[in-house]
From Swiss-Prot:
Keywords: Actin-binding, Repeat, WD repeat
Record bears the keyword tRNA-binding: no
Annotated function: Binds actin. Enhances the F-actin depolymerization activity of actin-depolymerizing factor (ADF) proteins.
Name of the protein: Actin-interacting protein 1-2
Tissue expression summary: Expressed in leaves, stems, flower buds and flowers.
Residue stretches of each WD repeat: 2-42, 54-93, 97-141, 142-182, 185-224, 230-269, 277-318, 322-362, 445-484, 489-528, 532-571, 576-609
A molecular-function term among this protein's GO annotations: actin binding
Annotated source species: Arabidopsis thaliana
PANTHER family found in the cross-reference section: WD REPEAT-CONTAINING PROTEIN 1, WD-REPEATCONTAINING PROTEIN WDR1
Length: 609
């Protein structure tokens, strides 16, 4: 089985803080982080993605070495890992640099030194070290609070500038680096500092809405970005143009601005770029930016990445987005197998198209969390953690109608009957709720702890799984259930049940890592010994032709079984998703779509043996 497409997660963002993305001008790729993943994304083809997931803690920042061969990435534990940018991402070194989170790091132009800054938790807040040995190259005094950004002058004589939450901009000479002077021109957090490509100047931007330009060799103040047309909110990030004559800034006022920087260091506004936002709310605040070759990249708080062309700023930007949190549910739309709907637990539903990637976010009227969902043609049903079921009708990317129904209990699982679209069954801790046309018509207590559910498309039969590992088969008559049989095989609580598309079988899986395929008529096991996961099974899917079953697990693997062959002749994808697989679906008989804890969606192609 091989990976055919990855729809990448978007950068992790935080309200009130900027993110510092970086790139490699030779390969036209950018680097950003989400959770424990470091994502390398091609600006010319966002489907060309590589993900590094070896950090033990959430990664915060990543930078290419000057020659583009190595990447240094830092995480919240203060560790910096240096690894190969290509092929197998071989680890070169790992150093414990700070006692707390790393917020920024930079390579020196000769690729020999790295400076990192962040939160020292009472110890040093900045450290510069040799990239191969980790030995210190200087003392960095002068800061009293978290250091949000650092920069190394790209030309000799080397200089290091740092800035942070104590409103200070500190200047160090070296190597070995030592404190030279401090500037107190800003009156709020200083969020980002960057040197011009020729090293003659550097600029700092701050939450006081100011940008100040300094001499790169002496740290003397040269000028400011003009306040007449300035930002009306905190400035979170700044990036120089490749020729060093302009800078790009992004702000909480939802705009990006390009400034002309004169030789004497004053900045006048050239253009204001308005990134067309989707929400109109705080999610449109811009928190990160990068100017690389002809690409001007901005990132919003909601994770939307906009790519402008620097040579044609009037052209509307190419925009795409995705998930920031665990993608816990996934549905391949049967009527149109090219479309995939995915839901993450923060309440975001995205639409994807095979071969094209991101197609839009569904604009919901209520952004409640999503625990599980079911989709059918133009309707989605979701359940969260607030005892409510939401029925969402959508057309294109717009939700035309969203209604919430309080069922009085915490929903565990839900199932639609597509051929009887007014019927919806929802399980809770001790029973099942019938909903018809958006109203609760009956609540049935089943007398055991319920964990999973599946209903036939015509709404005449249901399988309900229990905490005790038993499968209860019921026939549905009107709004009541009649128990027909109890199947015993599982040794753990049932986690998921699915009927095959031809309705001749159903498959069940449990928290004790076993899956079973059952014949629906004889109620005998059709495929057993599906015991190849090493942790609980979270999700399960059938191929459209009903010959294959795929299972996804907390152990990060996806396993595809052919029903007519022994379980041992399985196909396995190891490490499909960092942190575990939570959503699965078949696009067709040779493509499996998976989603997981890493907020990514992947399409795998295979040939049945």
């Amino acid at each position: 089985m091989e990976l055919s497409e990855t729809y990448a997660c978007v950068p992790s963002t935080e309200r009130g803080r900027g993110i510092l993305i970086s790139g490699n001008s030779k390969s036209d790729t950018i680097l950003y982080t989400n959770g424990r993943s470091v994502v390398t994304l091609d600006l010319n083809n966002p489907l060309k993605v590589s993900i590094y997931g070896e950090h033990a803690y959430p990664a915060t920042v990543a930078r290419y070495s000057p020659n583009g061969e190595w990447i240094a990435s830092g995480d919240v534990s203060g560790t910096v890992r240096i690894w190969g940018a290509y092929n197998d991402h071989v680890l070169k070194n790992e150093f414990k640099v700070l006692a707390g989170r790393i917020d920024d790091l930079q390579w020196s132009a000769d690729g020999m030194r790295i400076v990192a800054s962040g939160d020292g938790k009472g110890k040093s807040l900045v450290r510069a070290f040799m990239w191969d040995s980790g030995s210190n190259v200087g003392e960095f005094d002068g800061h009293s609070r978290r250091v949000l950004s650092c920069a190394i002058k790209p030309t000799r004589p080397f200089r290091i500038v740092t800035c942070g939450e104590d409103f200070l901009v500190n200047f160090y000479e070296g190597p070995p680096f030592k404190f030279k002077l401090s500037s107190r021109e800003h009156s709020n957090f200083v969020n980002c500092v960057r040197f011009a490509p020729d090293g003659s100047k550097f600029i700092t931007v701050s939450s006081d809405k100011k940008g100040i330009i300094y001499d790169g060799k002496t740290c003397e103040i040269l000028g400011e970005l003009s306040s007449d047309d300035g930002h009306k909110g905190s400035i979170y990030a700044v990036s120089w143009s490749p020729d060093g004559k302009q800078v790009l800034t992004v702000s909480a006022d939802k705009s990006a601005k390009i400034w002309d920087i004169s030789d004497n260091g004053s900045g006048s506004l050239n253009t204001t770029l308005n990134c067309p936002g989707s929400s109109g709310g705080v999610d449109d605040m811009l928190v990160g930016c990068l100017w690389q070759n002809d690409h001007i990249v901005t990132v919003s708080l909601g994770g939307t990445i906009s790519i402008f062309s620097a040579s044609d700023l009037d052209k509307s930007p190419f925009q795409f987005s995705g998930h920031m949190k665990n993608v816990s549910s996934l549905a391949v739309l049967k009527g149109n197998a090219d479309y995939i709907l995915s839901g993450s637990y923060d309440g975001l539903i995205c639409k994807w198209m095979l071969g094209r990637g991101f197609c839009g976010k569904l604009q919901r009227t209520q952004n409640s969390q999503i625990k599980c969902f079911a989709a059918h043609e133009e309707e989605i049903v979701t359940s969260g953690y607030d005892n409510k079921i939401s029925r969402i009708s959508y057309k294109d990317d717009q939700c035309t109608n969203e209604e919430s129904i309080d069922i009085g209990n915490q929903p565990k699982d839900l199932s639609l009957a597509p051929l009887s679209p007014d019927l919806l069954l929802v399980t809770f801790e001790s029973g099942v709720v019938f909903l018809r046309d958006g109203k609760v018509v009956s609540t049935i207590n089943l007398g055991f702890i319920v964990t999973a559910l599946a209903v036939t498309p015509d709404g005449t039969e249901a399988v309900i799984g229990g905490q005790d590992g038993k499968l209860h088969l019921y026939s549905i008559n009107g709004d009541s259930l009649t128990e027909e049989a109890v199947l015993e095989r599982h040794r753990g609580a049932i986690s998921v049940i699915r009927y095959s598309p031809d309705l001749s079988m159903f498959a069940s899986a449990d928290l004790n890592r076993e899956a079973v395929v059952w014949d629906r008529v004889s109620r005998e096991m059709k495929l057993k010994n599906m015991l190849y996961h090493s942790a609980r099974i979270n999700c399960l899917a059938w191929s459209p032709n009903s010959t294959m079953v795929a299972t996804g697990s907390l152990d990060t693997c996806v396993i595809v079984y052919e029903v007519d062959k022994p379980a041992s002749s399985r196909m396995t994808i190891k490490g499909a998703h960092l942190g575990g697989v939570y959503g699965l679906g078949f696009a067709d008989d040779s493509h499996v779509v998976s989603s997981g804890e890493d907020a990514c969606i992947r399409v795998w192609s295979f040939t049945p043996q």
